[in-house]
Regions:
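Gram-positive cell-envelope targeting signals
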Residues: 1-31
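Active-site-adjacent loops and short helices of periplasmic peptidoglycan-processing enzymes
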Residues: 27-193
């Protein structure tokens, strides 16, 4: 489980970097290393906070305190919390799929298509593993809510509290999760230094 958690944490860091920085490099062999130079390489992202994970040194920062919306990177934190609270044996257990897991985005006219996972309310054959796979699909918001509902003991709000506690534990500053899926919420921008 610790390997999975380390992998998920690395995935979170990688996703934050990918969302923050677009750098393309081609290596002819595995020994080649791309040297990023912020003085000569074009940075397309509006905000960046890049850290060398081996040394903890800040490699590059741009608008690091500017509040940005994290969108689907939120689902990576949802995945981390889920993996921390589920044993390998639990992955095959079925989950409850109540209407509560769908209401917050289908009742809001701002969310035109919050799902690509084709999960239906009251579906009775869905497992934790299915939800974790669906979670990584674009806009599979109901999968995030289903995980939050089930792991939070029937309370999505309780799960969101777990996400915020984990963010603090990881040293994320200025981070405040208000949902498990990352759909837009005016109360939720975080700075690039947030994670």
């Amino acid at each position: 489980m610790k390997k999975i958690l380390r992998f998920a944490s690395a995935l979170l860091c990688g996703a934050m970097l990918l969302c923050s920085l677009s750098v393309t490099a081609f290596a002819e062999n595995d020994d080649e290393v791309y040297d990023f130079d912020p003085n000569t390489d074009k940075i397309y992202s509006e905000a960046v906070y890049m850290v060398n994970t081996d040394t903890g040194d800040v490699v590059y920062k741009k608008n690091e305190s500017k509040k940005m919306y994290p969108a689907s990177t939120t689902k990576i934190m949802t995945c981390i919390i889920a993996l921390e609270h589920l044993s390998e044996g639990a992955l095959s257990k079925k989950v409850e799929v109540p209407y509560d897991c769908f209401n917050d985005f289908y009742e809001d006219p701002n969310y035109s298509d919050p799902s690509n996972a084709a999960i239906e309310p009251l579906q009775d054959n869905l497992t934790y593993k299915d939800c974790l796979y669906a979670l990584m699909l674009p806009s599979a918001c109901e999968a995030a809510n289903i995980l939050a509902y089930n792991i939070g003991g029937g309370s999505i709000t309780k799960f969101i509290g777990m996400m915020n506690e984990k963010a603090k534990e990881l040293g994320c500053t200025g981070t405040n999760f208000v949902n498990a899926h990352g759909l837009h919420n005016d109360n939720r921008p975080i700075p690039a230094t947030g994670c």
